[in-house]
Amino acid sequence: NLNNSKFKQLYEELPTPNVYRTASGAPGHEYYQQKADYEINVELDEEKNILKGNEIITYTNNSPDVLNYLWIQLDQNVRAKNSHGQLTSTNSMNNKMSFRNIKRMHDRMDFDGGFKLEEVKDTYNNDLSYVINETMMRIELPKSLRKGQSFSFKIKYSYNINDRMKIGGRSGYEYFEKEGNAIYTIAQFFPRMAVYNEVEGWQNKQFLGRGEFTLPFGDYKVNITVPSDHIVAATGELKNASSVLNKNQIKRWEKAKKNFIDPVIIVSQEEAKENEKEKSKLKKTWTFEAKNVRDFGWASSRKFIWDAMAVDISGKTVMAYSYYPKEGNPLWEQYSTRVVAHTLKVYSEYTIDYIYPQATSVHAKSIGMEYPMICFNFGRPESDGTYSKRTKYGMIGVIIHEVGHNFFPMIINSDERQWTWMDEGLNTFVQYITEQEFERNYPSRRGPPNNIVEYMKGDKSGISPIMTNSESILQFGNNAYGKPATALNILRETVMGRELFDYSFKTYSERWAFKHPTPADFFRTMEDASAVDLDWFWRGWFYTNDHVDISLDKVNWFKINTGNPEIENTISKNQEENKKRYIGISRNKSSIKKTITEIDDQSIDFYTTYDPFKTNILDEEDYNKYIKNLDEDEKEILKSEKNYYELNFSNIGGLVMPIILEFTFVDLTTEVVRIPAEIWKKNSNQIKKVFILDKEIVKVQLDPFLETADVNLNNNSWPARNEPTRFQIYKGKDRNNENPMQRAIRAEEKSNE
């Protein structure tokens, strides 16, 4: 027979431990990783929306392997005409199509995207042989690169910057037609090294647009040349502030470095408005440096307002920055930098102390995207300055999420191209904690188990396991963000408990900070640091698309038969009398005038008048003999008057989970009982469990605190009860689209009339 147990260990699913990655989930004694250092010069041509650049990459081979070629990522090529990313993306036509959708299809087809490479040379200006395969480029090395050796080479390139509002994308620009200005959010803007390790060899899986990035750590020096009236935000630290900022701005910046309470405005809204009026033809070069980062991103605009505040992380000062246009106010000035600071503090508590010198939030319509020390975030009020609740909390949530990505995957550097959940899921989990610490009862979208129920009970043909490659995931947001975040919340609150979970999660973060973890490293560390066997949990939640639906089928109530004829005969007599409540018996009293035994004495015998519930001397003697043969413990049990309740459960959804029960007693007091998931170890389909209780129960509730993501609450109660589905009744169409702030303003104006 095959072992199909849901508690089967994950020996077959997880890779064999080795000198690079241990069975405990920690890096092995021969763990290594490569290094890629960059010197980059880029210039923004605002008129033509072209970015021109050149770079020197120094690649260091720390592996024990000899390398004969290098793989470089050309992510911009995903936007090249007829790229695999475009050809493999699916779309469809309907009987009605909006102009916007049709125009976007045309714009994507017509856009001349992708890197234009002018030269690929070594540092002695010798041409290097290379082959481009879609979003990957293989460079042939002049000679083999052995362990500990480095190789430097140069690439000169350019590409057309995409209009994000027309064709989408993680980076690009947003054009403000009324004033003729733009906000540039620039990333994947330079050819980048692929990762080489003992897990994948070269991770050169093509970039098709969804599965994000797998990148080695390195040091960056980046010179960014833009129009002189632009303000630039970027990964790393600004090294030439005196060349690009005026004296007042530098003075405000220095003030912000000492202000830990409120943000300080460095570039004001009035200054940004002045910058917007005229497009300078002059250029300025901003120089940034970053140490031990895996990537680099930047943003540039003359529209930017800039504010900042200091954050204390374990005695070290870290700067929180926000860059946003006037269109972002009042939301951004009030919240963005404060949210950045809050996020750094909470994530540092639950993972590792934030190690970088700054974290930046940049306003960018319609996207949320992350890079080391910088992220691009949506959240724009209405033109009148009001905003909906959804806009406010959506903005705060996306800032927390994208700033949180500094930890996952920028520091704890997982393979996004392979496993989206390892950064998005873990990040969304800590995002939930951060949101709840920002505001009590914060309306978090993801994290609470009941929020994932609709997804998990859906059609299984449209649901893939969490352990699915990024490009093949179905229902991307629920699969890679919502479900893993929910799973970790359930581990923390229900399976492991906060103390064990938090220690283990922090251990994983510390072990794999500035390294490249895999799913096995995470799974093994969580068990290693807690002494909790979680293989059943990983198997069910991460390797299947099963859901939670545990049914409380039946509750049977038992009482001990004392053997005492005086007691038991009375009970039996009452039970027999209850049977006579049958309506036919009561009607027979009037419809049957006389029975045969009432008419004819000859039809009467012993049993006609025999009372089986009358105690006689023999019954008493039998009872006394029975009692005499009992020891004291047995006599106590006999006298205890305990209630024995046998509960029957079925596992309908397939996921084995802990059983949480709330008993309500006849005196309306309650008791909660928590049973580990291992109760299903012998039979994962149906189980019975007996509970010995002092008081009678009137109600049993399964999963009373909605902590297991059970998809069907209608089979969770005894006595059974249905949860009502509420419906809304309306008259005609509600055409009022104002947000609550607009309505409040209108109400105030009306009351003042």
Language model segments and positions:
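Non-catalytic accessory/interaction domains
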Residues: 207-210, 231, 238-249, 254-259, ...
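Solvent-exposed beta-hairpin/edge-strand motifs
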Residues: 71-125, 225, 229-230, 664-674, ...
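Hydrophobic helix-coil surface modules that form long, contiguous segments used
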Residues: 191-202, 208-400, 429
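Hydrophobic alpha-helical and helix-loop surface patches within well-folded domains
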Residues: 5-23, 36, 288, 320-627, ...
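Early extracytoplasmic/domain-onset interaction patches
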Residues: 1-73
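Short, hydrophobic/aromatic-enriched beta-strand segments in well-ordered soluble domains
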Residues: 55-57, 61, 74-76, 149-163, ...
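A surface-exposed beta-strand-loop module
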Residues: 50, 60, 66-67, 97-176, ...
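Glycine/proline-rich low-complexity spacer/linker segments in large multi-domain proteins
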Residues: 82-97, 158-220, 241, 310, ...
